[in-house]
UniProtKB/Swiss-Prot annotation:
Record topology, Extracellular segments: 1-93, 146-168, 230-276, 349-368
Pfam families assigned to the protein according to its UniProt record, in alphabetical order: 7TM_GPCR_Srw (PF10324)
GO cellular component: plasma membrane
Organism from which the protein derives: Drosophila melanogaster
Name of the molecule in the record: Sex peptide receptor
Length: 435
């Protein structure tokens, strides 16, 4: 099930075939000098993991037919087979560069504003970490996507071997690691806000800046350890072919021997993807949906209490409750936008696992397209957070204006300011201010 490619996730699988069908290769005589590719004729298959004599990456290349073939039944890596070109070219080649620029600008502004001393709060620290990870998720694969799809080099065999390794690291492993950190930070953000709103006394102990920093470091470490085997589970062997009339060294992909000898291909990939679908996709989404519902219910109760305080003319407490509700609402919106982009990925990933391990029912050609679209909309959601912060956080807007328009443009009445998560930093006290 080694199917991770492109920005975040990309399956190149289809209904499984018999071992005889798996080993069937296109006639090498069909290969023409210069390696002219047909238009997107990739064949998508699921290997028989019971037959461990068949090396998985070898098989993955062989099923591509002519676009993966080389003489003497040796295949090499070419990206034309990895993605449906009718979708990959417009999404990755033409739209993604614009999204990359917008994401870099918007998330850089978020980091710049949230890193100011006046914005230094525990949850702002988590929001800043999310912005950095989302930005890196897009930056790492950008050079490869531009080269392959924007500049139209997808039909060429990837070479030399060092380029194959770099492409795998920056287009598969690093984006997956950064996205995993972002998912877990989003979960930490929701848990932290739930503690603030529903268990305020605990926030004094658990939601301090040192604890949040340690938690962020642990999350980054766990995400790195989760992806660490992926740096070493494949071996790229040099293979010389004739390309455009000249010898060219390309990549022949094999599963590393330590996977075969100590774990087994079946167990290795099953464990990796089961962990990912459970702890990166399904469980975080389920917990986030639950916390969002609980936070919304708590916010409704606080709104009723605010009306009571207003009738009793207790304006100071009324203002504190209003600001807390505004902060909670903003974080609910941030998490909801994340869930809208993440849940489809979780669903398709779970369906892929079930179809591969239990009962085969998934149309992998359609799943390929769905994953590409969900990847695209996930990246599309990244710049939206900047608009949410500007629209729903007064102090974010004030700090932004102070940075770019000067202090004269910033309003002087700090008593009405509230931070993204922790209330006002001067006159108004909330449960979060004392942290």
């Amino acid at each position: 099930m080694d199917n991770y490619t492109d920005v975040l996730y990309q399956y190149r699988l289809a209904p499984s075939a018999s071992p005889e069908m798996e080993m069937e290769l296109a006639d090498p005589r069909q290969m023409v000098r210069g390696f002219h590719l047909p238009t997107n004729e990739s064949q998508l298959e699921i290997p028989d993991y019971g037959n461990e004599s068949l090396d998985y990456p070898n098989y993955q290349q062989m099923v591509g037919g002519p676009c993966r073939m080389e003489d003497n039944n040796i295949s090499y890596w070419n990206l034309t087979c990895d993605s449906p070109l009718e979708y990959a070219m417009p999404l990755y080649g033409y739209c993604m560069p614009f999204l990359l620029i917008i994401t870099i600008i918007s998330n850089s502004l978020i980091v710049l504003v949230l890193s100011k001393k006046s914005m230094a709060t525990p949850t702002n620290f988590v929001l800043m970490g999310m912005a950095i990870c989302d930005m890196l998720t897009v930056i790492f694969p950008a050079p490869g996507l531009w080269y392959m799809y924007t500049f139209g080099n997808h039909y060429k065999p990837l070479h030399p071997v060092s380029m194959c390794l770099a492409y795998s690291i920056f287009n598969e492993i690093m984006p997956a690691m950064c996205h995993t950190i972002s998912v877990w930070l989003t979960l930490a953000l929701a848990v932290q806000r739930y503690i603030y709103v529903c268990h305020a006394p605990m926030a004094r102990t658990w939601c301090t800046m040192p604890r949040v920093r340690r938690c962020t470091a642990y999350i980054a470490l766990l995400a790195f350890l989760h992806q660490l085997p992926r740096f070493f589970d494949r071996t790229y062997m040099p293979l010389v072919i004739e390309w455009n009339g000249s010898p060219t060294e390309v990549c022949h992909l094999e599963t590393s021997m330590w996977v075969h000898d100590y774990i087994g291909v079946d167990l290795y990939y099953t464990s990796y993807y089961l962990f990912r679908v459970l702890f990166v996709h399904l469980l975080p989404c389920i917990i986030l949906v639950t916390l969002n519902i609980l936070l919304f219910a708590a916010m409704r109760q606080a709104q009723e209490r605010r009306k009571l305080l207003f009738r009793e003319n207790r304006k100071k407490e009324c203002k504190k409750l209003r600001e807390t509700n505004c902060t909670t609402l903003m974080l609910i919106v941030v998490v909801s936008v994340f869930l809208l982009a993440e849940i489809p990925i979780a669903v398709v990933t779970a369906m892929h696992i079930v179809s591969s391990l239990i009962i085969e029912f998934l149309d992998y050609g359609l799943a390929n397209i769905c994953i590409m679209l969900t990847n695209f909309f996930l990246v599309f959601s990244y710049p939206i957070n900047f608009g949410i912060y500007c629209g729903m956080s007064r102090q974010f807007r004030e700090t932004f204006k102070e940075i770019f328009l000067g202090r004269l443009m910033a309003k002087k009445d700090s008593s009405t300011k509230y931070s993204i998560v922790n209330g006002a930093r001067t006159c108004t006290n909330t449960n979060e201010t004392v942290l």
